[in-house]
Amino acid sequence: MKNYSGILSYTQSISYQLGIGENLDAFILKSNSRIMFWKNKMGLRKWFEKNRNFIWINNPQAKFDIEALNSYNNIFLNNISIFITGCNSSLIPFLKKNKFEIMKTGKEAILNLDYAHFRNKSLKEIIRIGFKHGNIIEVPYSDKIRDKLEEFKSECTHSNEPQLKYLYNDILLPSNRLFVFESENGAWLGAITVRIMDKEKVITDLILRSKMATKGTMEALIYSIFGKIKQEGFISWSLGEVPYIIYDSPKLTKEFLINFTGRRLKFAYNYLGLYNFKNKFEPEWQEVYTCGKPKLNLTTFVKAASFSNMTTLVRSKFFYNLYSSGKAFRNNEIKRKPVNSDYSKVS
């Protein structure tokens, strides 16, 4: 029995040799999603779901035949637990029919390319300021450009923090389109990668902003991409999901607890800043679901958080904030201490 662990993308350009056969590969490609296989090992993670094996499918954008996956149960030792994140509403009837448990865990920002998303005067001014500092270009894929984008990530906001993994396509693929905000001296100040979902829809993968970016950089970039793909005949553009912005869940349900807990972790993952940025373009917010079979256990979310590096990010930011608070307190105490505390010597 091989130890299956890794990730297979929706495109063949990234290949992890899992040895799982062509049929399952076809299922993965058909579902246009990312799929991860993680077989439990003895040790710290044993308690999560006992010996139940765990498959995580992220961001499926098309209906797929669940039987194509179930037929490969013999790959694993015993039972199988399927965890699907990033489901849009079109998948929900199919998943309900296949006895998945379903909960709302976020919303996706959709731009209608026939709608005036940039009519706000303050947004127009920000875009105008952005265009003063450079130009937007589309950069064709090459190995050199892929490597340059990886280097650019180290220059971006939050690059010194633990990075999330597997929640989106985090490297440039041949099937991606790359748009860059380039300064007058040729430096990259912002980058967005998108992929063509079908003849109507475009989906955002990466949104990267340099630490050196000026005001309006990302707004100008989005404005330019919007115009470009509209001219090409597309109908909608997804700016991606914002998690934890579900506020109408019945209290003390699993859906409520997941969203409530996620919002408490804003110090580590600033979902609200992400929401405010995307919301300035007046998108249509469509609900995004997380689905599980046979059911959604809270421990499965913990497992996914660990695998995606979220727990590492939370731990890092928690101790950094704790250290910063302690340092600020000590500095404040030093400032408050009088230079000469022996008042009897003051005439």
Model-derived regions, located:
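A conserved beta-strand-loop-helix scaffold within acyl/acetyltransferase catalytic domains
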Residues: 2-58, 83-254, 268-276, 286, ...
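Short, basic/hydrophobic alpha-helical segments
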Residues: 66-77
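Short acidic, S/G/P-rich loop/turn micro-motifs used as interaction or catalytic elements
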Residues: 61-64
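Short active-site oxyanion
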Residues: 78-82
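A short acidic, glycine-rich active-site loop
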Residues: 260-269
